[in-house]
Amino acid sequence: TARYRALADEYDVTINLRPVYPLAIREPNFFERNHPNWMRYTFLDMFRVATFHGIPFGPPRPDPIVQDVATRKIAADQPYIFRLTRLGQAAARRGKSLAFCHEVGKLVWGGAENWHEGDHLKGAADRAGLNLAELDAEVLADAEALDAEIGTNQAALEASGHWGVPTLVFNGEPFFGQDRIDMAIWRMEQEGLVRR
């Protein structure tokens, strides 16, 4: 999300980040049925792209998705991801999902240990201009409606022609992955995108 946030800061464009549950939640057997090298390569590529772009990156501690790495089986008990995704959708209701998800992503994927404890998430919400206590109260009181909105986001993602994240959709055309951001900018410039 760092590169998407930079894109929104640098260009005259608004990015409406629409949170979805990760593929591991939407299709728990996805990882088990893929080639064993798929996960290894995906993580290798994530580290490589982050290093190439100078983005701090480290393994999540803990991973928001509880999974047996050896078998690739997704655990039935998921103590982190539902709260995180609902918080992201609550931020989306306020027009701040990109900022919030970027700040939380820096914690989770930036190597912060125990990002889910103490004031880590509060600090992320503060930096995004949000109040974590307010978001958490909404997550508890309105979980069903938030999940319905997340489901709508997931349907829109699949309707765009892709299933993975990050996917940027412009004029109905999906651009999947960090390596497609420059191509998305190129496409938007063809339609009149200008720098701020």
Positions of predicted regions on the chain:
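C-terminal cap of thioredoxin/glutaredoxin-like
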Residues: 1-13, 101-196
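Structural alpha/beta surface segment adjacent to cysteine/selenocysteine redox centers
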Residues: 2-108
